[in-house]
């Protein structure tokens, strides 16, 4: 069939051992099968590790493709994503990562409030990476997290509120303050 990838000439493209391009892998991050999503993340990691300068050249696509998978329902996909972001954050300088930090913090916060406890716990792994990479942004305005009258909506405040919610602390602290 003409649309089959085996017939495409990829001799001048960067590919994985399975002859998948970044475009193929990005598409596979949306696949219904968790195994395919995990393989897509690991394929993107392979491209980053194999080709010098690939991360810098395709930073936006590499980060944005995996961000929605932070809250994936499959444990293996989340594990691959945490490993993937661990490598990416180690290799990216702060300036290159800065445009993506707010989105990653927001999606990490979202994963921390997921209905599944396993997703919430895995989000803490990513939070740890973010606290190492962008500590000032991640903790910005954290001290007002339990203040019901605070109009602030900073990353630190949201992260701490999500963390307290995971522990069941926020409601108790608020009730004690009221009365």
Where are these regions (language model features)?
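Amphipathic alpha-helical segments within extended alpha-helical solenoids and repeat-rich scaffolds
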Residues: 15, 65-71, 106-114, 130-136, ...
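Hydrophobic core/packing positions within alpha-helical solenoid repeats
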Residues: 43-47, 84-88, 127
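Alpha-solenoid HEAT/ARM repeat scaffold
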Residues: 38-42, 60, 79, 121
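Internal, conserved structured core segments that host functional sites
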Residues: 117-132
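Flexible loop/turn segments at the boundaries of HEAT repeats in alpha-solenoid HEAT proteins
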Residues: 7-18, 48-59, 89-101, 129-156, ...
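Short coil/turn segments at helix-helix junctions and helix-capping linkers
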Residues: 24-36, 65-80, 95, 107-119
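Conserved hydrophobic register position within alpha-solenoid helical repeats
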Residues: 40, 81-85, 123, 178-179
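N-terminal "cap/leader" segments of large eukaryotic alpha-helical scaffolds
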Residues: 1-45
């Amino acid at each position: 069939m003409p649309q089959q990838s085996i017939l495409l000439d990829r001799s001048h493209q960067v590919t994985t051992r399975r002859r998948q391009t970044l475009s193929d892998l990005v598409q596979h991050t949306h696949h219904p099968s968790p195994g395919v999503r995990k393989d897509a993340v690991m394929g993107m990691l392979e491209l980053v590790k194999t080709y010098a300068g690939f991360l810098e050249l395709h930073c936006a696509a590499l980060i944005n493709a995996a961000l929605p998978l932070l809250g994936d329902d499959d444990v293996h996909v989340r594990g691959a994503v945490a490993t993937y972001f661990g490598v990416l954050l180690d290799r990216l300088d702060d300036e290159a990562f800065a445009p993506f930090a707010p989105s990653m913090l927001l999606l990490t916060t979202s994963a921390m409030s997921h209905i599944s406890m396993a997703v919430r716990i895995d989000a803490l792994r990513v939070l740890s990476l973010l606290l190492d990479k962008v500590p000032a942004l991640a903790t910005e305005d954290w001290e007002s997290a339990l203040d019901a009258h605070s109009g602030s909506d900073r990353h630190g405040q949201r992260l701490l509120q999500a963390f307290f919610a995971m522990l069941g602390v926020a409601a108790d602290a608020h009730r004690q303050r009221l009365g």
